[in-house]
Swiss-Prot record:
Family: Belongs to the P2likevirus tape measure protein family.
Organism expressing this protein natively: Halomonas phage phiHAP-1 (isolate -/Gulf of Mexico/-/2001)
Coiled coil: 20-127
Pfam families attached to this UniProt entry: Phage_P2_GpU (PF06995), PhageMin_Tail (PF10145)
Task performed by this protein: Serves as a base for tail tube protein polymerization and acts as a template for tail length determination.
UniProt protein name: Probable tape measure protein
GO annotation terms (biological process): viral tail assembly
Source taxon at top rank: Viruses
Keyword Phosphoprotein tagged: no
UniProt entry keywords in alphabetical sequence: Coiled coil, Viral release from host cell, Viral tail assembly
Claim: Translocase is one of the keywords in the record: no
């Protein structure tokens, strides 16, 4: 198809150039008319001269006759005078009068003779054969009539050009009107899409909230109406300034409730009591998320882990959150990192004898040097566990503990009573050892993976004392998290977030009212779209894309607008076609005028050369007619398209019959070869493009013969290309894969196996061995629809049962050889109540057929 587009673009460029040259062609035509008018005036002048010449000849003849009569009378009177010897006065007077008359007539005769000679010279210069004056006079009259006829034809051509221009203007007006209509329709589409978007926003918000609460319902058994109660409370909670500062939405708050429900903390509660407990937990976790700059889901999970892992109630968890926030503000760490460490190892610390706040303090000390969270958490765990190991301590560690002055059992006991003191003493004892032994002691007691977390503590034991001191008094950190959240909430961004949350609540409530309507409208629309999607999937060559619009009335309006827009596009195609035809008519009229003008100028030039011999003049005029005939014949050949090209080839072969058997036979051999076929397909779009450019150039030059020949070649080439494009894949003579036959294929896979295998060799690389090229395989697949396509499947099976090979020809007319039908597979779907399958996916497996005994030219099948 790419070649076809190239030709079309070139042709359109030619028409555009023709339209732009309309003014120049009209001006040239006016110039031609002025030339013909000048020639007509010249012919009229010659006619008047010939009329004067003929009249003067008559006057000259009358003058000569009168002169003869006067001379005869003079002679007679002279004789009478001589006879009378004494002429009378009367006779003398008459004689004098006759003499004067003779003198006057002689002068007039000389004048008329001179004028006659001048006219004869002028006419001879104009090519008038005075030896055949009557014929020349008739020729001039005929030329004058023909010139007048040409002028009338030119006026008609001018009118045709004007009509063509009017059609072009009308077509352009229709194009502009269509464009304006499509622009207006696009505006309606944008408006509809905007309405659809505005309508979808509430439904999307409502569906998002509905989905989030459906997840919560998996872990909390809601009674009737409770899901909506929780959802509404979440939307209101999202607009709380302490929570809105972090941009938490109602769906995010549902993640906190999911964590609470999954933990089972509120499973023993029912109704309003559970609602109050869950919402209080949710509010605390949401404030924690805003203060700690973590997600709502992570804050909820952390709260649950603290309460379950460290056996805390709600107030204790809130107190731990305050301590964590306070430590994060006073140490080189963040509340979020410390929260994660406590989620991982908080239960280990409280089991070993630390309170939740003391565990947070020790965690802050481990994180303070900038230690990574994972390393600090590992060192924290190993440090607490090994100190609290007691009698389970290994001999090697016991020996090391004794060297430091500790008994493992005593350490474990004291940890349950005075854990911070024991931790300080252990760290001080390790620090008191020689510097080169501290790492070895740490590795022996707590493991290699703990060195990176414990060694920084030995350098700065004051940080440990400071951490424990920060949580020793509740007054120091109580309410720290709430104050942090209030500080973040006191910003314009929070005000904006509150307004956004309220708008989201309104939009969600509107969407809740729209969802029942959507649920009623969506199923039938979805069923139709599903069938269209199946059809699109099976007919990708016909359908480019299928888009579903919004639900309800918006979807219906979008569909109507789509149909209207498509009809306008189709109408625009018609308008463009009319515009192209009008421009072509205009260019055709201009070409005809140019051709007529060229022929007229040729005849006039030949006629002006007619001053020579009569025979020569006729020969030259005959040649002019032949030229005109040649131009007309060329134009006819151009209109005939390929026939003109064929006629030219035939003329060439007749002109040189000896050459025909040479180059034509050679060309036939090359054209029938494989290389010739490939070259022909490659050269076809190039030739069509060149032909379109040639037509445009010929039209611009005004050469009728050139226009006819180039246009004929182009039309013939396009006809050949159209014939090529009409070919379709066929298997044998019976079966064609096409839309028209109800059985198109959607994909073709061709496999060629080179026959290489690898042979394993002991203690060496494998060896490649070629066992001979395997037979090629082709796999065709597509979708057949009820009921014509299923009949074609039966035809394929009937061909398979004949157990013979078939010739396969592709869509470009290439013979792919003979192939065996190995299998015909089908899968029936969309089965309706009576068992009829509305859709059948099929696969045809072909394998190359090789018969050494058969002739290579045998393509039957």
């Amino acid at each position: 198809m790419a070649s076809k587009y190239s030709v079309t673009l070139a042709a359109e460029d030619g028409y555009s150039a023709a339209f732009r040259g309309f003014a120049e062609a009209a001006e040239q035509m006016q110039e031609n008319i002025r030339g013909h008018q000048a020639e007509l005036r010249e012919l009229n002048r010659l006619g008047r001269q010939m009329d004067g010449y003929q009249s003067l000849q008559g006057d000259l003849a009358a003058t000569a006759a009168a002169l003869d009569d006067a001379r005869e009378k003079q002679a007679r009177l002279s004789r009478e005078m001589r006879e009378a010897e004494e002429p009378s006065r009367r006779l003398q007077n008459e004689y004098d009068k006759a003499t004067a008359t003779v003198a006057g007539l002689s002068a007039e005769h000389r004048s008329q003779s001179n004028e006659l000679d001048r006219l004869q010279g002028s006419l001879e210069e104009a090519g008038v054969d005075l030896s055949r004056f009557a014929d020349e006079q008739r020729r001039i009259e005929e030329a004058t009539r023909q010139t007048n006829s040409v002028l009338e034809d030119q006026r008609a051509r001018m009118q045709a050009v004007s009509d063509a221009q009017a059609r072009v203007t009308a077509a352009e007006g229709r194009v502009a009107a269509n464009r304006e209509a499509r622009s207006q329709l696009r505006g309606e589409m944008v408006e509809t899409l905007a309405l659809g978007y505005l309508a979808s926003r509430p439904m999307n918000s409502a569906m998002d909230m509905e989905t989030s609460m459906a997840d919560v319902a998996k872990v909390i058994s809601f009674a009737e109406g409770e899901r909506e109660q929780y959802a509404n409370a979440n939307l209101r909670l999202a607009s709380d300034r302490l929570i809105a500062s972090s941009g938490i939405r109602g769906t995010d708050i549902a993640d906190i409730q999911y964590a609470a429900g999954q933990s089972g903390i509120f499973n023993e509660m029912e109704g309003q009591e559970r609602f109050d407990g869950v919402m209080e937990f949710t509010r605390q976790a949401a404030i924690m998320a805003a203060a700690f700059d973590v997600s709502a889901g992570d804050a909820g999970s952390a709260m649950v882990s603290w309460r379950q892992g460290m056996n805390l109630d709600g107030d204790q968890a809130l107190q731990l959150a305050d301590a964590t926030n306070h430590l994060g503000n006073n140490f080189n760490t963040t509340a979020a990192d410390l929260t994660e460490l406590l989620v991982r190892q908080g239960s280990v610390a409280t089991t070993a004898g630390l309170s939740a706040e003391q565990a947070a303090a020790l965690g802050a000390a481990f994180l303070n040097p900038g230690t990574q969270r994972e390393v600090a958490a590992t060192g924290f765990k190993n440090f607490i566990l090994r100190i609290n190991q007691g009698a389970a301590t290994t001999d090697k560690r016991r020996e090391q503990w004794n060297a430091l002055g500790f008994e493992p059992e005593e350490l474990a006991r004291r940890m349950q009573v005075e854990a911070p003191t024991v931790i300080r003493e252990v760290l001080q004892a390790i620090r008191a050892a020689p510097a080169d032994e501290q790492s070895a002691i740490t590795e022996t007691l707590f493991g290699t993976e703990s060195i990176g977390a414990i060694s920084p503590l030995l350098v700065n034991l004051d940080a440990v004392d400071k951490a424990f001191n920060e949580v020793s008094d509740t007054a120091r950190y109580s309410g720290s998290m709430l104050r942090e959240a209030e500080g973040v909430a006191d910003t314009s961004r929070t005000t904006w977030n509150v307004x956004t949350a309220e708008v989201a609540r309104l939009v969600t409530q509107v969407g809740n009212g729209m969802l029942p309507v959507f649920e009623a409208v969506a199923p039938p629309v979805t069923a139709v779209i599903g069938y269209m999607a199946d059809f699109t999937e099976a007919n990708t060559e016909l359908v480019g894309a299928l888009a579903a619009g919004a639900a309800g009335l918006v979807a219906v309006k979008a569909a109507v607008l789509g149909v209207r827009y498509a009809s306008l596009l189709i109408g625009q195609v018609g308008n463009q076609g009319a515009l192209m035809r009008a421009r072509l008519d205009q260019r055709t009229a201009q070409t005809a005028l140019a051709a007529d003008g060229a022929v007229g100028r040729l005849n006039a030039a030949i006629n002006r050369l007619g001053g020579g011999a009569a025979g020569g003049g006729r020969n030259q005029r005959g040649n002019g007619s032949a030229a005109a005939g040649a131009a007309g014949a060329a134009g006819a050949a151009g209109a005939a398209g390929a026939a003109g090209a064929a006629g030219a080839a035939g003329a060439a072969s007749r002109a040189a019959p000896g050459v025909q058997n040479g180059w034509r036979a050679w060309a036939a051999n090359v054209g029938n070869s494989r290389a010739g076929q490939v070259a022909g397909k490659v050269a076809l779009p190039v030739a069509l493009t060149a032909g379109a450019i040639g037509v445009a150039n010929a039209v611009g030059g005004g050469d009728a013969a050139d226009v006819g020949s180039t246009a004929g070649g182009l039309v013939g080439g396009m006809g050949g290309f159209g014939g090529l494009m009409r070919q379709q894949m066929a298997l044998g003579e019976e079966f064609v894969f096409s839309l028209g036959s109800g059985f198109p294929y959607s994909s073709l896979q061709r496999r060629s196996d080179g026959g290489w295998i690898e042979i394993d060799i002991t203690y060496a690389s494998p060896s490649s061995q070629n066992t001979g090229q395997a037979l090629e395989q082709i796999r065709l697949s597509g979708t057949a629809f009820y009921a014509a396509g299923m009949q074609r499947l039966d035809e394929l099976r009937a061909m398979q049962s004949e157990r013979r090979p078939y010739v396969l020809v592709d869509g470009l007319g290439n013979n792919l050889g003979r192939w065996k039908i190995m299998s015909v597979e089908e899968q029936q779907t969309r089965v309706i109540d009576d068992g009829t399958a509305m859709k059948v996916a099929w696969v045809l497996q072909l394998e190359e057929f090789v018969d050494d005994a058969a002739s290579s030219d045998d393509d039957s099948g």
